[in-house]
Amino acid sequence: MLPTSSPQIHRNGSLSERDAARHTAGAKRYKYLRRLLHFRQMDFEFAVWQMLYLFTSPQKVYRNFHYRKQTKDQWARDDPAFLVLLSIWLCVSTVGFGLVLDMGFVETLTLLLWVVFIDCIGVGLLISTLMWFVTNKYLMKHPNRDYDVEWGYAFDVHLNAFYPLLVILHFLQLFFINHVVVISSDWFLGYFVGNTMWLIAIGYYVYITFLGYSALPFLKNTVVLLYPFALLGLLYVLSISLGWNFTKGLCWFYKHRVQ
């Protein structure tokens, strides 16, 4: 979607006072939160397109972030449609976990509140803030006030990376819970299937996070964001060798937190 107007730029390259005020973090945050109350203004079709391409070609998703920067002078999303759809996915999959684990209504509701407000929002805010600090502090090519990683963009990168992880671990894995956790939890096939799904899910998270920050032209050495793959591979080999079952641990954790 093309904007109806573009920011006015002075000859010295700075925004006019009116446009600068409009592009402050507070103004962007207010506009984003306001649109949460107006579903008709959200582009859900485009959000679905992004969700599909996060699995098949995540680079295309970040090309759109480049386009938004050129047309709207911000890297972060200004449309909360993606967040709304992600929240729906999270709620539906959590209810599915409650059903598969034979939880009652109150237990499922408690699990849903934990997953939404702690696992998704709380952990998401923590990771986004950490990445925002690290990238601005250590990965800037030329630190200055004109170029910085927006906190909203760091949060968007987290949401992008979190979505495939959510689908794999909270949706697709539901179809294997009985075999991975109940029937074959201590068998090689059980923890091999479960741990492989964890490997793929976390691998997606690391890779999409790397793509998000490598898309910013003013950052350097973003390849360091791929280093967790080494630890991930080591943990996977150890888990298979020692018979650790991550999915069984997740189910135990979910049941324990609602008791």
Curated annotation (Swiss-Prot):
GO terms for biological process: protein localization to cell surface. It is found in: Nucleus inner membrane; Golgi apparatus membrane. It comes from the Eukaryota. Its main location: nucleus. The chain crosses the membrane at residues 81-101, 111-131, 163-183, 199-219, 223-243. Keywords: Golgi apparatus, Membrane, Nucleus, RNA-binding, Transmembrane, Transmembrane helix. InterPro entries: UNC-50. Involved in the cell surface expression of neuronal nicotinic receptors. Binds RNA. This is Protein unc-50 homolog. It comes from Danio rerio. The lineage of its organism: Eukaryota, Metazoa, Chordata, Craniata, Vertebrata.
